A protein has these predicted regions:
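Conserved catalytic core of the tyrosine transesterase superfamily
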Residues: 1-294
Length: 294
């Protein structure tokens, strides 16, 4: 089954355009499922056996996972991964129907504009070298000032240089969108590029780790965690909270919901609305008029 899981991982990367984080989680789920079914059935797990898996088998697997302390949200993600894996092995639509746990959607808690800037400044001030300080500031300003996901910011390459008034961003499932760049955000990136000791070619990562490799999102998360403790901010003050704040502050200042969908790269803000195209000029006007740091 190891080869089957490897093939599924390649399928996720090539055909489903899943992020590295999602692929790791899904592959881990597949390994857990195979291990569980082997013990549950008392027999070696094969592709043919997986094709015959029952709803009762899946309920038993989820019950075991829930006994490990899995939340409803995590259990729902686990079930989604299981369905995807079984559909890959046995064919689309062959997985037994199983109702997932009800997930209560939490309300994002944004930080204030002043808190967002203070957070970025504190992270930058804690860096050991000026170019690392400039890097961390630029990354966090992309999250708050342009609404990028951390993975989108770290996925940027030298192809975005030289910077203009907008930025082309590749988001989830390889969807590309155009986001305006506030002067302050653009200046932050340019300051980092000028100080960065590593050459940034078109195909190279824009944001580098201390040794020149790709900057790890975990490093930014840890830096934010340390900064929020020093500043007395809540534990929900994360890199992603800056993106939530971007959206919340724009809406509070009258930004059009459909324009915001485009800026965030969401299929919908309510999980039911469709992804709406808005012309770039209108997006720029909405952005300049609504963003508190514009």
């Amino acid at each position: 089954m190891k080869q089957t899981i490897v093939a599924w991982e390649a399928h996720l990367a090539q055909n489903r355009r899943r992020s590295v984080h999602t692929m790791r989680a899904y592959v881990a789920t597949a390994h857990r499922l195979v291990e569980f079914l082997g013990a549950h059935w008392g027999a070696e797990v094969s592709s043919d056996r997986l094709a015959a898996v029952t709803a009762a088998d899946l309920r038993a697997f989820l019950a075991l996972r829930r006994s490990d302390g899995l939340s409803n949200a995590s259990a729902a993600r686990e079930l989604s991964a299981v369905r995807g894996f079984l559909d890959f092995v046995a064919g689309e639509g062959t997985t037994p129907r199983l109702k997932g746990p009800r997930v209560k959607r939490g309300v994002p808690r944004p930080v204030s504009p002043d808190e967002a800037v203070a957070l970025a400044e504190d992270v930058a001030d804690s860096a050991v070298e000026p170019w690392l300080a400039a890097r961390d500031w630029a990354v966090l300003m992309l999250l708050y000032g342009a609404g990028l996901r951390i993975g989108e910011a770290l996925g940027l390459t030298g192809a975005v240089l030289p910077l203009g008034a907008t930025l082309s961003v590749t988001g989830k499932r390889a969807k590309t969108r155009i986001v305006p760049l506030l002067p302050r955000v653009r200046e932050g990136i340019e300051a980092y590029v000028e100080l960065c000791p590593w050459p940034i070619a078109r195909g190279e990562p824009l944001f580098r780790g201390a040794k020149g490799g790709v900057l790890d999102a975990a490093l930014i998360r840890r830096a934010v965690q340390a900064a929020r403790t020093r500043l007395g901010l809540g534990d929900r003050t994360t890199p992603h909270a800056l993106r939530h704040s971007f959206a919340t502050h724009l809406l509070a200042r009258g930004a059009d919901l459909r324009a915001l969908q485009e800026l965030l790269g969401h299929a919908s803000l309510s999980s039911t609305q469709i992804y709406t195209a808005v012309d770039a000029a209108h997006l720029m006007d909405v952005y300049r008029n609504a963003h508190p740091r514009a």
